């Protein structure tokens, strides 16, 4: 085990990505960081979001390292509709050193309606400004239409959310008392929504996934309550296919830095740290000019 990593993840915890030598040392580093963080008063309750099939393994390793730790481990039954509220209430009211749950269970704990609405409104405003810029510069009609379609989809989502009444029987993520989040296999959340005016560039993905939107909101909330010191990601492959994945990781872990440097929009980030090049590459239909 590396003491430096434990200190960084436990004390600094300003959006670290842990790159493990092996899986056991990874879990021990994160567990020790969480417990040291609590011992030093840097956090009160840590939540571990891990792959669904590894929850029991993580619990076993936690107790192996800290036999007297007070941990709560989610089972499949705990997140059945009839039991979910009760389990979340246990998290909120219990003085646990750590809570361990699977990725899919983590997604089932919603953020407050107000926070969800705020994120959608920000995305709609961003796209509206982008469409206006494109119309001014007389960009391709196809590009504008595509953005208008994305905007409409987000507006439908927002209207649906606003039409829902307040659900009194739901415990939100903010109510759990969690102030430190550890995410194992964090590359599973790489497809967060990205607005960009770039088109026809290979490897540029603007797909969105609900689980990525959900964790982005949770990361922003933790940044607010901890001063950007509440999130630790663990993955061996933070970037696998596209540069957008690097930007996405920075949005999760270094939002404050992106804001300070005025790089919170992908196009500004890409123009600072990269460049688009065109080369002849082999495509299914033969050789073609591909932008990257």
Predicted features and spans:
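Conserved pre-motif I regulatory segment
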Residues: 1-24, 28-32, 189, 198, ...
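Conserved SF1/SF2 helicase motif Ia
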Residues: 14-21, 28-70, 223-231
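Short basic/glycine-enriched coil/helix segment immediately N-terminal to the Walker B
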Residues: 10-14, 68, 89-93, 120, ...
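Conserved helicase motor
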Residues: 73-85, 102-108, 208-212
């Amino acid at each position: 085990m590396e003491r430096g990593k434990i200190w960084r993840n436990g004390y600094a915890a300003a959006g670290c990505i842990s790159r493990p030598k092996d899986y056991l040392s990874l879990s021990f580093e994160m567990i020790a960081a969480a417990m040291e963080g609590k011992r030093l008063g840097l956090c009160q309750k840590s939540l571990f979001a891990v792959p669904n099939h590894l929850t029991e393994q993580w619990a076993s390793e936690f107790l192996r390292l800290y036999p007297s730790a007070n941990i709560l481990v989610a089972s499949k039954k705990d997140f059945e509709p009839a039991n979910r509220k009760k389990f979340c209430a246990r998290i909120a009211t219990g003085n646990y050193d750590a809570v361990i749950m699977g990725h899919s269970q983590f997604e089932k704990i919603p953020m407050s309606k107000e926070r969800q609405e705020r994120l959608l409104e920000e995305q709609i405003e961003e796209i509206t400004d982008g469409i206006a810029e494109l119309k001014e510069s007389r960009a391709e009609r196809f590009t504008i239409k595509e953005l208008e379609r994305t905007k409409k989809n987000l507006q439908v989502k927002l209207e649906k959310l606003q039409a829902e009444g307040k659900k009194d029987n739901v415990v939100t993520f903010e109510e759990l008392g969690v102030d430190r989040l550890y995410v194992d296999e964090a590359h599973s959340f790489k497809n967060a929504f990205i607005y960009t005016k770039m088109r026809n560039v290979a490897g540029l993905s603007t797909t969105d996934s609900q689980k990525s939107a959900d964790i982005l909101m949770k990361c922003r909330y933790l940044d607010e309550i901890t001063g950007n010191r509440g999130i630790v990601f663990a993955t061996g492959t933070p970037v696998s296919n596209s540069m957008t994945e690097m930007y996405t990781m920075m949005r999760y872990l270094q939002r404050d830095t992106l804001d300070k440097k005025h790089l919170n929009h992908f196009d500004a980030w890409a123009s600072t740290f990269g460049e688009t090049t065109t080369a002849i590459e082999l495509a299914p239909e033969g050789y073609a000019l591909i932008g990257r």
